[in-house]
């Protein structure tokens, strides 16, 4: 990804294997200017593909594994959709859930398509000294007088909605966590200048979350680095991108002298929620967006249990039920009522609701009651040796 002052050029190399040889290849793409398409080093002419209505269609592709190289230009500085890659507050950042990655590159933008990713980001060192993406940083290099590049490698297959990029001028707070097996993980909080003194509670909350997931679910963090970016201009509350969580500052920053207990607990809970997604959502993700609550309802249940274990189980349960009655019950009784597993939708972004999250968490809690804690835990600890089977 080559970041310039007025545009970004994204060159991708996809290794593809046809499941049904003879069928056309269809990829998603929105607001992209295609500069070139190449299959197995052979450039395609405009007559060999069509690009319309958010779909790239290549009718004739090899029947065996092949490599597709695409080169597209996009303008994140004029992107007002708040999806894909966009500029806000002097930073470039991404929001790819649910269908935002198609605004970055041509891709099979579905949650059941899992891929290994390696990303190289190049930008101006003066305007973008920090370049972040998923996984571990494996190479840093100087490119010309005022340009640099960082290459990130994520060894675990993930869908495109978990891709993340942040580029800009941020301050770093660094710490470390030693997992139960003895691996050392580097923890980094990236904040805007002047926010450094207000990060201690968030860092401590992250460490507590990691330790709780190990002790309760026997789930260790699986990479060498974990990054959280907290910026005021992020349009969502928080996003669980693999190893690069992006937060609105209000859910990370806290002054211990002035923050209320409720604010501190909220920060701790949301940081835990996004961290718990590392397994319940990222490593094991949903087959399609109709299954959204299988990651969100489950992870809400997990963060509820985390807060209950660290503080008061009774108080936490009362708070959760009060919230359910005041918000989700009203949704269920109104014109926007919908099931936890919807049968259809016009736009998936409309389904990030209290029904999917909080009512979904209650269904997970009910399953634990019906199965009993031991059988429930055995079911939840399922992981498949095949990444393709991890979309369930």
How would you describe each model-predicted region?
Residues 152, 181-384, 388:
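Hydrophobic alpha-helical and helix-loop surface patches within well-folded domains
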Residues 1-225, 250, 255, 343, ...:
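Acidic/His-enriched low-complexity segments
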Residues 391-392:
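Ala/Thr-enriched low-complexity intrinsically disordered regions
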């Amino acid at each position: 990804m080559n970041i310039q002052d007025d545009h970004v050029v994204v060159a991708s190399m996809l290794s593809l294997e046809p499941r049904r040889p003879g069928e056309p290849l269809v990829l998603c793409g929105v607001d992209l200017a295609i500069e070139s398409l190449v299959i197995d080093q052979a450039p395609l002419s405009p007559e060999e593909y069509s690009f319309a209505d958010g779909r790239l269609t290549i009718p004739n592709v090899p029947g065996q594994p092949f490599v597709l190289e695409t080169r597209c230009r996009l303008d994140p500085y004029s992107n007002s959709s708040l999806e894909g890659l966009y500029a806000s507050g002097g930073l470039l950042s991404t929001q790819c859930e649910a269908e935002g990655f198609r605004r970055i590159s041509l891709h099979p933008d579905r949650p059941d398509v899992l891929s290994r990713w390696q990303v190289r980001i190049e930008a101006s060192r003066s305007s973008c000294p920090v370049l972040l993406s998923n996984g571990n940083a494996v190479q840093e290099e100087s490119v010309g007088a005022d340009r640099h590049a960082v290459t990130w490698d994520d060894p675990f297959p993930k869908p495109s909605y978990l891709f993340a990029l942040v580029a800009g001028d941020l301050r770093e707070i660094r710490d470390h966590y030693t997992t139960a097996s003895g691996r050392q993980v580097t923890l980094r909080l990236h904040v805007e200048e002047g926010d450094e003194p207000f990060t201690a509670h968030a860092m401590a909350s992250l460490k507590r979350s990691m330790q709780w997931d190990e002790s309760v679910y026997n789930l260790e963090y699986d990479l060498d680095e974990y990054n959280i970016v907290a910026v005021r201009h992020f349009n969502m509350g928080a996003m669980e991108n693999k190893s690069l969580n992006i937060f609105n500052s209000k859910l990370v920053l806290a002054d211990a002298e002035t923050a209320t207990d409720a604010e501190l607990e909220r920060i701790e809970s949301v940081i835990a929620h996004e961290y718990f997604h590392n397994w319940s959502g990222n490593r094991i993700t949903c087959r399609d967006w109709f299954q959204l609550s299988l990651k969100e309802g489950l992870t809400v249940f997990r963060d509820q249990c985390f807060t209950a274990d660290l503080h008061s189980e009774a108080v936490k349960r009362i708070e959760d039920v009060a919230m359910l009655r005041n918000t989700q019950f009203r949704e269920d009784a109104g014109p926007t009522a919908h099931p936890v597993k919807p049968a259809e939708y016009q736009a998936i972004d409309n389904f990030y609701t209290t029904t999917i999250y909080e009512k979904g968490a209650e269904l997970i809690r009910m399953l634990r009651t019906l199965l009993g804690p031991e059988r429930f835990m055995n079911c939840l600890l399922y992981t498949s040796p095949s990444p393709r089977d991890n979309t369930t």
